Amino acid sequence: MTIHAFRTLAFGLLITAVLSLGGCAFGEFRPSDPFDRQYTLDEAQHRYTVLVRFSDFQKARKFVAEDHKEGFYQRMRALKDVHFTGYDSESVELDEEKTKATVRVTYTMYTPALPYEVEVSEVQEWSRDGIANTWRVVSTFEGLQQLVAN
């Protein structure tokens, strides 16, 4: 190998290494959302959903919109005998202004009174004020009342 070929190869490897490290340092590039609000929403939504899935409703309540917290907690306390076995979350639908989002989550659960698994859907409507990254949820459950009534 000639010195010129070796220098060209070394230069190419150096450029590749610099570009790779630069990509790691700066993370994902999102030109449509430079403040990275979508990531914060995804994380808040995931944490809330996991807390509900593990019946930690007191902690999940921290993510609920202020004027819905008490109603949420009262509804969820009725699930004290429910055992969640899993959940499936659809992708987040974020509006153009990036201040509102909707997510549908399907939980799988059972109760001692119903020894078979049933699915209950939750529609999570997330919102935030301005460019703040504090997302709050208002949730609506479909099929929850029938489960609690049994």
Segments from the language model and where they lie:
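N-terminal secretory signal peptides that target proteins for export/translocation
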Residues: 1-7
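Low-complexity, Gly/Pro
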Residues: 2, 26, 39, 63, ...
